[in-house]
Design a protein with these regions (language model features):
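Cytochrome P450 catalytic-domain "roof"
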Residues: 145
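Anionic-ligand binding patches
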Residues: 121
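Short, acidic/turn-prone active-site loops that include or flank metal/cofactor-
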Residues: 125-128
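Short, thiol/selenol-centered motifs that function as redox-active sites or metal-ligating centers
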Residues: 103-105
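Extended, subdomain-level signal for the structured scaffold at the beginning of enzyme domains
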Residues: 1-100, 109-112, 118, 130-140, ...
Length: 186
């Protein structure tokens, strides 16, 4: 049975951070669904690209999820942080030790919910102070996994972020295979 992932998209999400994860996880055979937090599946990225998600939050049950993923970008990250049904779901997953992941500005959603207290984490450089104030142990590593939480720095680390998720859900061999297939050196 293939692993199941959901990535949550709001208007203003960072195109590459969101879609790189979707692309690479699908290449790895992981069933990842794009989820709009709006009432409609139409989303506009931070760079003005209009796209349709697979589903909306209210139409979806996440009981089969192996991981929940947040892309960064502004103002998308602010919208994700303000959407209570999502923060409630993330809190439930974190409390159960289930995998959650965020990149760029989005680790601030986790830190704002108290998830990063005393955990090693990373984020976009201008958000490092934010996550540190919320109790995280900031790292400049491209991708950091501490327990059930994975964080990454930004657009330039999106491939490493996606490969880390593949490695966690499938295997290092599968992540290496995907990296080789896209001519990417890990």
């Amino acid at each position: 049975m293939s692993k199941k992932a959901y990535i949550f998209l709001a208007d203003g999400f960072e195109d590459i951070e969101g879609l790189t994860v979707v692309d690479l996880l699908r290449r790895a055979g992981i069933d990842i669904k794009t989820v709009s937090i709006k009432e409609t599946t139409q989303i506009q990225t931070s760079h003005g690209i209009t796209m349709l998600t697979d589903t909306t939050f209210t139409e979806t049950s996440f009981t089969d999820a192996d991981i929940l993923v947040l892309p960064g970008g502004m103002p998308g990250t602010k919208y994700l942080a303000a959407y209570k049904p999502l923060t409630d779901l993330l809190t439930d997953f974190n409390n159960k030790g289930k995998k959650i992941a965020a990149i760029c500005a989005a680790p601030s959603v986790f830190s704002g919910l108290g998830f990063l207290k005393d955990k090693k984490a990373t984020s976009y450089p201008s958000f490092m102070e934010v996550i540190a104030k919320d109790g995280a142990q900031p790292s400049e590593d491209s991708v950091v996994t501490d327990g059930n939480i994975t964080t990454s720095r930004g657009l330039g680390t999106a491939i490493d972020f996606a490969l880390s998720i593949i490695e966690q859900l499938e295997s290092k061999e599968k992540a290496d295979e995907i990296a080789e297939s896209i001519v990417y050196k890990r």
